[in-house]
Amino acid sequence: MIWKRHLSLDALNATSQNTLVAHLGIVYTRLGDDMLEAEMPVDARTHQPFGLLHGGASAALAETLGSMAGFLMTRDGQNVVGTELNATHHRAVAQGTVRGVCQPMHLGRSSQSWEIVVFDEQGRRCCTCRLSTMVLG
């Protein structure tokens, strides 16, 4: 297991109360040895005007996952902030739920890079993101 902080899924989800994460319906669903996973509904909260998943919602899911994964890689007195997010959208999603899977690409002392892949309910890749974070403290 790569994580330096050990929180339960309930504790991770509790951090989302009264935030954009909760408003979008994002829920952490799995914390593996080297991955963090969350789901987000595709509904009126996350649609763009044409009834499809908004690219910004996919980006918010990705940044949520990467930032929390980055936080889990810090020690007491440290935190992380996102410095760059890149998203490539591959496929439209009109309804259902999407699942984001976050894994590390680089874990340095002062910077981290995370790959977040968003899948539809059929397991098809919808979006590929990369989040860079800076470790503070």
From Swiss-Prot:
It holds the Pfam family 4HBT. Pathway: Siderophore biosynthesis; enterobactin biosynthesis. Its EC number is 3.1.2.-. GO terms for molecular function: 1,4-dihydroxy-2-naphthoyl-CoA thioesterase activity. It comes from the Bacteria. The keyword Oxidoreductase does not apply. Its main location: cytoplasm. It is an enzyme of class 3 (hydrolase). The keyword Electron transport does not apply. It is found in: Cytoplasm. GO terms for biological process: enterobactin biosynthetic process. Keywords: Cytoplasm, Hydrolase. GO terms for cellular component: cytosol. The active site is at 63 (nucleophile or proton acceptor). InterPro entries: HotDog_dom_sf, PAAI_dom, Thioesterase_EntH, Thioestr_dom. Required for optimal enterobactin synthesis. Acts as a proofreading enzyme that prevents EntB misacylation by hydrolyzing the thioester bound existing between EntB and wrongly charged molecules. Homotetramer. Dimer of dimers. Interacts specifically with the aryl carrier protein (ArCP) domain of EntB. Belongs to the thioesterase PaaI family. This is Proofreading thioesterase EntH.
